[in-house]
Amino acid sequence: MSELYSLRGAGMRYNGTEVLHPATLDFSEAQMVALIGPNGAGKSTLLGIMAGLRPGYLGRCAYGGKEVSRWPRRAFAREVSFVPQSVRVEFPFTAEQVVMMGRTPYCDGLFESAEDRSAVERAMALTDTIEFRDRDFRSLSGGEKQRTILASVLAQSPRVLLLDEPTTFLDLQHQVSIYRLLRDQARQGLLVVAVTHDLNLAAAYSDRVLVLRAGEVVRDAAALEVLNPETIRAVFGVDAEVRHTQAGKPWILYGD
């Protein structure tokens, strides 16, 4: 597998407080990685550094052998797509127009190409958004908006997907379908890195799990190694029972 990201002592300090301790990590293509940990653990900060959205970070964060901060924005956008926790659209764009915005890094003129339209059609089919393609984005439910934004970044045809809680607002059916889609994208060669609070989704679909606590990466391994009662208690402060599915994946139970 080809290495895409190389982080060496990458961290972040705000107003004298170290919100992400220096971390040394490598990320390769064809991988689905989950970032888990309590609120304020540094997950979104790490993702933001990788997305080129945290200027002034400590250490090094290189993508494709070049420091993220030195990439031209348009060229970087063709390589790396980022999905934030929420997106605001103030103007009356349809869902399809929002998805077409994902093609912006490729547009050289005023009109979209046949390739642009094909990429949008495919992305909307994958995310089950075709049925409301003509609706005003602002009128969509939270889950519909989230799927539309995901379609937009898939239309971008990147090598890397960085997602900050991609299943926020989604019902159970679409949570599972989106994670299956992300896993399939990883199997097709993409690097997918997703922040999640759902440990069972992380366990079921991720190749690798990074655990963050108080700004520090404390575990980095396969879900089977990471998601155990001891780690869950130490990081999240809750007692849990971990069973295993027929496929050997951890399944976490809470409560008595």
For every predicted segment, state its role.
Residues 235-256:
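ABC ATPase nucleotide-binding domains
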Residues 36-38:
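The feature captures the beta-strand-to-loop junction immediately N-terminal to the Walker
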Residues 51:
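Helix-to-loop junction immediately C-terminal to a conserved catalytic motif
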Residues 136-140:
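Conserved ABC ATPase signature
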Residues 161-165:
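Catalytic Walker B motif of ABC-type/P-loop ATPase nucleotide-binding domains
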Residues 59-67, 76:
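Conserved ABC transporter NBD signature motif
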Residues 100, 114-132:
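Conserved ABC ATPase "signature" region
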